Amino acid sequence: MSKHESNPSLKKTLKQIKPDKITHQFDQSTLGEMVLPQGSVASEQHSYHKLSEASQLLEQGVKQQQDGELIAALKSLKQALQMFQAVGNIEQQQQVLCFLSLVSYTSSDYKSTIYYSQQCLALLQSHPDLSIQIQALSHLGNAYRHLNDYKQGINYLQECLRITREMSNKRSQVAALNNLGLVYKAAGQFAKAIEYQKESLEIVEELQDNWGMEQVLKNIGNTYYALDNYPEAIAYYERCVRIARLLNHIRSASKLLKNLGSACCATSNYGKAILYYEERLQLARQLEDIRSEEQSLSSLGFACEALGDYKKAIKYYEERLLLARKIQDVRMEEQALASLDFTCKALGDYAKAMQYQQGNL
């Protein structure tokens, strides 16, 4: 083992927080046993302590990233990088830079994501590591997408896909194809986006990876929704929400139910929309998610109103009004009162409409 190699005694999988992207499966060694570099005894001891401390900081930074402590993670990882640079450990510099890129991406600092990823790629020219390379390319592609530089994003993700195919790494192919779908969708090239996303779905189904299927199905649904192809969007969202329920991903299911309700409303299928919104309302209350609860009540009121069921619409709008007053949200209260005013008038109850108009109820 050379002085730059680490002992992969324990591996951690990088965690990606962004809900609409699938990161590559990237195993990170935790820097166990290392062979000391040649030199005097004093120099060897100094380097050993540097490496040991740097390794601990890297592990600490990874743990902080996984716990969502992003500022602390950046601090730990930057310190680790300086120490690995001081002893000339190239492989560990690559790994730290890859983590710094991930933490920056998770923090929505896309320029820093690009900076660290490009530094990582520069080191990879002399010390190749395909697993780290696909991660760096993935971060670059996704970061450029967020900066609306779709051409650059596509270039990096195409290179990422090429390497994953060369490695026959199917899980990483799923991520690369999915992320290419996202950048093509952002660029308005919906047909191309669907082509990549469906290829990603085929592989993830073959792998029987429910978590991956949930992500890919949601993204295909979103692309069809952007195309105003609501029946296809509904079909993919329904498959997706079944998996979210299976995995007990309650927050994900809540968001999908919102999308399903919106797509059903777009096709004037208000009865079905109400079923989805009612389920979302139950989940919102289970999660104690006030914002989702008020959105669900508003959506339910709208859907009932569209069906001409004004009494039921008023019930939901009144619940929204009570919630707005409970959390002292003036804007929400004004919206609820306006909805109640309009619905009462539609019902012919002008006296009650006047009371809502004046805010007396």
Language model features by range: what are they?
Residues L58-Q66, Q92-T106, S131-N148, L157, ...:
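Conserved alpha-helical positions within TPR/SEL1-like repeat arrays
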Residues Y317-E318, L322, E334, A338-D341, ...:
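TPR/TPR-like (Sel1-like) alpha-helical repeat modules
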